[in-house]
A protein has these predicted regions:
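Helix-biased detector of long, well-ordered alpha-helical tracts
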Residues: 1-226
Length: 226
């Protein structure tokens, strides 16, 4: 929703999501291609803003933008990013490698991106009723940033490499913990047990879930975009 999603952030996020896919295989992204289809309702300055975000992400993660295409669209905006990465053959990590008695480990804070979206949607509704209102997003800064400007976990890949750790199976969380763990189980032909009391729940998650009357575990399991 471009009402609250700046095009610069959209370009940045589109790249980072694809870099994250490479990280999820224990690899490092080196190159990307970007193809954009855009309608005539977008000004040239809007495309500049979009590519500012794309280039910022490339600079942040030391990734080369090596090609792509720009064409017209009958309506709306379409962005397609392809990422190319490298990983040692012995360290490549697939969804299908999980073994019996493996420990399921989650990195980072789950559920914040979804709550950031809920906050932005709420403030949009307030704005539609009163266009003169100015939202105070400072108390929700981390959550909103998780939605608008996520970061790929290249730090985790570096940590694993530094400590000579190669996971048996790995995936990034796009659609919530429950969806992704099912992907791992199905690909590896294994089952798993998750303990809700062992899943980390950030204080900001608990606070905003209480504000929105949401169940923290449901947000973590089904929120996505973490």
């Amino acid at each position: 929703d471009l009402t609250y999603f700046p095009l610069k952030h959209l370009g940045y996020k589109a790249v980072v999501c694809n870099i994250s896919d490479i990280c999820a295989m224990n690899g490092t992204c080196k190159q990307i291609t970007v193809s954009v289809a855009v309608s005539n309702r977008f000004k040239l300055e809007s495309l500049d803003e979009l590519y500012d975000g794309i280039n910022l992400a490339c600079k942040r993660y030391r990734v080369d933008l090596v090609g792509g295409d720009t064409t017209s669209s009958q309506k709306g905006l379409i962005i397609s990013v392809t990422s190319i990465g490298v990983v040692d053959q012995k360290k490549i990590c697939k969804r299908s490698g999980a073994n019996n008695n493996d420990l399921v480990v989650c990195s980072g804070k789950l559920g914040l991106a979804y709550l950031g979206l809920q906050i932005l949607e709420r403030e949009k509704q307030v704005f539609l009723v009163n266009p003169n209102s100015k939202p105070d997003l400072e108390p929700y800064k981390e959550l909103v940033e998780r939605q608008l400007k996520p970061e790929a976990r290249i730090d985790l890949i570096n940590f694993l490499d530094k400590n000579s750790i190669t996971p048996t199976s790995m995936i990034d969380i796009s659609d919530g913990l429950s969806s992704e763990i099912i992907h791992l189980c199905n690909s590896s032909e294994k089952g798993c047990v998750l303990y809700s009391d062992k899943i980390y729940k950030d204080q900001s998650l608990l606070k905003v879930c209480d504000e929105f009357n949401l169940d923290p575990i449901s947000v973590i399991m089904s929120g996505g975009e973490d």
